[in-house]
């Protein structure tokens, strides 16, 4: 029905629209044996993907997620968008944050405010912001932070870049200056604990004792 490119590969973003067209033109094979569908990370699915899901699985659903944790603004959904796909749904908001300390939550609120968020009073170290004049100075600063981490007694450090391309480039730079730096990419077959350089997309679901966010400026995160 659909013509692929010469390499016979379809883009991920095109799959749901093509599936929706296929269902509209040829009908859909309803998966009636599924009685209740649970969807996690709701913010990572686009509205058209939810339309396809509704066509294939007309059963009751529980959809969970956090719109603030979306890593792809061009292929994501807010709670309001999901309500348009499931018009009879009921929305329940859980506003108390248990995962992060009060200090981390307060910093996050300065970056992206959420007036409904209620942080718990679990305190920890204040996040530090280090200004650097250029990329070379930043690399040196990260190497020093890695050295401090190794003397801290903690076991996991995540160096989280915006994109996988940035993560690969930074990992190569750091590996010149220090040992035991692992790159976690879409090609990785396993997650290695310790000091990990990765992208925001790959870091979803992972937890670290300490985190470094390089290139955290308006030019990179615009």
Residue map of PLM features:
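Coupling/switch/interface segments within P-loop NTPase motor domains and analogous charged loops
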Residues: 1-16
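Conserved helicase motor core of SF1/SF2 NTP-dependent helicases
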Residues: 23, 27-36, 43-222
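Short, hydrophobic/amphipathic alpha-helical patches that form generic packing surfaces
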Residues: 12-27
């Amino acid at each position: 029905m659909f013509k692929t490119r010469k390499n016979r590969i379809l883009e991920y973003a095109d799959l749901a629209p093509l599936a929706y067209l296929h269902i509209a033109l040829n009908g859909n094979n309803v998966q009636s044996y599924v009685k209740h569908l649970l969807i996690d990370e709701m913010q990572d699915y686009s509205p058209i993907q939810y339309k396809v899901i509704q066509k294939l699985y007309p059963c009751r659903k529980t959809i969970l997620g956090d719109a603030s944790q979306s890593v792809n603004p061009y292929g994501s959904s807010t709670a309001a968008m999901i309500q348009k796909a499931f018009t009879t749904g009921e929305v329940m908001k859980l506003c108390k944050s248990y995962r992060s300390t009060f200090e981390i939550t307060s910093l996050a609120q300065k970056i992206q405010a959420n007036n409904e968020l209620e942080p718990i009073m679990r305190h920890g170290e204040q996040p530090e912001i280090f200004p650097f004049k250029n990329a070379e100075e930043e690399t040196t600063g990260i190497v020093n932070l890695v050295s401090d981490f190794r003397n801290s007694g903690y076991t996991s450090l995540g160096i989280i870049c915006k994109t996988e391309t940035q993560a690969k480039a930074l990992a190569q730079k750091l590996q010149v200056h220090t040992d035991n730096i692992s790159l976690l990419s879409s090609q990785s077959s396993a997650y290695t604990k310790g000091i990990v350089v990765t992208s925001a997309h790959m870091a979803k679901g992972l937890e670290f004792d300490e985190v470094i966010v390089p290139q955290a400026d308006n030019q990179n995160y615009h």
